[in-house]
């Protein structure tokens, strides 16, 4: 209060609001969440895509999303972006995978593979929360990245491919799938 300001409530002492602890997913809920995602992604992996018949000979797409299985790409540690780089990098699709659980967690695209993760990336926080929760319950994780280098250099085509893979695999850290899987690590 200012020295000349009237105090309408002299007997009321200001107290900070009590902070409530954030809700923490139980171990059973975490395992159920992962199991549902795993089951869905396994069905995608095992189901042959429907071949659409055309009346005309159409040029095949540069990139067929049905030919990309992120769990079969070469994995690199999540610290890949801390490595020195002599160029901004190339256009690619990148995937965040928990190889211990066989889960695809995130799908992304970039035109600068060596720079995309150097700054702020919301997925870093999801990964940290995911790993922290597993650590709390003594559960193993192996979160890695994988890259698919045959991505289109055209931004729009690359983003269309990214979206088709996000929707196909229903990767839980992508915002497009939060309504489906929830957002327990956001």
Predicted regions and their residues:
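GIY-YIG nuclease catalytic motif and its immediate N-terminal context
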Residues: 2-111, 156, 184-186
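Generic structural hydrophobic/aromatic packing signal, biased to beta-strands
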Residues: 94-96, 122, 165
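Conserved short loop/helix modules at catalytic or binding sites
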Residues: 84-86, 112-159
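Generic N-terminal leader/processing signal
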Residues: 32, 118-121, 172-173, 177
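Structure-specific nucleic-acid interaction/processing domains
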Residues: 148-186
């Amino acid at each position: 209060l200012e020295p000349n300001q009237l105090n309408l409530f002299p007997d009321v002492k200001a107290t900070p609001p009590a902070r409530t602890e954030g809700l923490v997913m139980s171990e059973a809920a975490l395992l159920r969440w992962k199991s549902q995602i795993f089951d869905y992604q396994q069905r995608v992996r095992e189901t042959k895509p429907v071949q659409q018949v055309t009346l005309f000979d159409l040029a095949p797409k540069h990139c067929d999303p049905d030919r990309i299985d992120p769990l079969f790409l070469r994995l690199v540690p999540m610290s890949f972006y801390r490595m020195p780089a002599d160029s901004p990098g190339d256009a690619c699709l990148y995937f965040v995978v928990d190889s211990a659980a066989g889960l695809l967690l995130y799908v992304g695209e970039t035109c600068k593979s060596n720079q995309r993760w150097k700054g702020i990336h919301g997925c870093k926080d999801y990964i940290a929360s995911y790993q922290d929760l597993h650590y709390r319950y003594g559960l193993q994780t192996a979160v890695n990245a994988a890259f698919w280098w045959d991505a289109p250099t055209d931004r729009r085509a690359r983003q269309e491919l990214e979206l088709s893979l996000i929707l196909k695999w229903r990767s839980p850290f992508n915002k497009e799938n939060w309504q489906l899987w929830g957002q327990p690590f956001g």
